[in-house]
């Protein structure tokens, strides 16, 4: 791994592998992958991951810890994840602040009820995960459409979890925008309420406008102008944090994705102040 500060990154997807392998150094600062998709993978795909990891630092964004679930954390899987993170010298590992299992995998990221009981439950699981992984983790604010039971606001819930678990936040700017539209809150006020010291990374992605008051987080389209504007505001508040462009399907030519990562870099430079390595 090259010891380079992480500023502007791109999600590592198998559908992008041929072009990523041909990508010139300096186009992005790092790549982000889901460890679940690569743990134990050998053969041609494993070799391609190793090739990319030799050229670019790797960050990881998990999919299946189910931090809000009720079943015990999968300690065997956490052990495999720790070895993967250690092998690739991963300094930024994040997971969704959600649950995705209930007596079986649900194949979706579902919101946790915004209650004090849930704060205590998920915080204990985050602390356990951090102990087993031997590192701090960042939780990501998710998009949600059917609001869970809310004894507190989403912002207050996230703040309480960050404090009680003593973990970090991966701020998904698109999710803030989508949730603000769908649940009628002010996105800038949400950003203002997040503790600066907890934010260690960001995501930007595209969404679908189902209706003026209904946005759907898809990761299948270019980032929209309103999200770019909100990202600029996030850079002003949190600095030039490591930021990943997420694109999960409908892949355009790599040059179009790199134009978006170049825009991330430009907004970081113009709005983020001193960069944080």
UniProtKB/Swiss-Prot annotation:
Gene3D superfamilies: Divalent-metal-dependent TIM barrel enzymes. It holds the Pfam family MbnB_TglH_ChrH. InterPro entries: MbnB/TglH/ChrH, Xyl_isomerase-like_sf. SUPFAM superfamilies: Xylose isomerase-like (SSF51658). It comes from the Bacteria. Belongs to the UPF0276 family. This is UPF0276 protein PSEEN3355. It comes from Pseudomonas entomophila (strain L48).
């Amino acid at each position: 791994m090259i010891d380079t500060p992480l500023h502007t990154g791109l999600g590592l997807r198998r559908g992008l592998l041929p072009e990523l392998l041909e990508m010139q150094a300096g186009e992005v600062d790092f790549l982000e992958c889901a460890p679940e998709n690569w743990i134990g993978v050998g053969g041609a795909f494993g070799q391609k991951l190793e090739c990319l990891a030799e050229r670019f630092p790797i960050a990881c964004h998990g999919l299946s810890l189910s931090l809000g679930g009720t079943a015990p954390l999968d300690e065997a899987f956490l052990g495999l994840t720790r070895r993967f993170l250690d092998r690739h010298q991963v300094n930024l590992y994040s997971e969704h602040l959600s649950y995705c299992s209930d007596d079986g995998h649900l194949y979706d990221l579902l919101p946790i009820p915004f209650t004090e009981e849930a704060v205590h439950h998920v915080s204990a699981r985050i602390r356990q995960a951090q102990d087993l992984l031997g590192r701090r983790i960042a939780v990501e604010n998710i998009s949600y459409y059917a609001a869970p039971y809310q004894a507190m606001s989403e912002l207050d819930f996230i703040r309480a979890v960050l404090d009680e678990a003593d973990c970090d936040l991966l701020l998904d700017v698109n999710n803030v925008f989508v949730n603000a539209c769908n649940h009628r809150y002010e996105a800038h006020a949400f950003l203002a309420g997040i503790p600066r010291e907890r934010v260690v990374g960001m995501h930007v992605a595209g969404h679908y406008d189902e209706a003026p008051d209904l946005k759907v987080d898809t990761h299948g389209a270019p980032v929209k102008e309103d999200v770019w504007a909100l990202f600029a505001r996030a850079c002003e508040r949190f600095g030039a944090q490591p930021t990943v462009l997420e694109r999960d399907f409908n892949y355009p030519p790599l040059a179009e994705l790199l134009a978006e990562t170049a825009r991330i870099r430009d907004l970081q430079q113009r709005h983020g102040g001193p960069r944080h390595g």
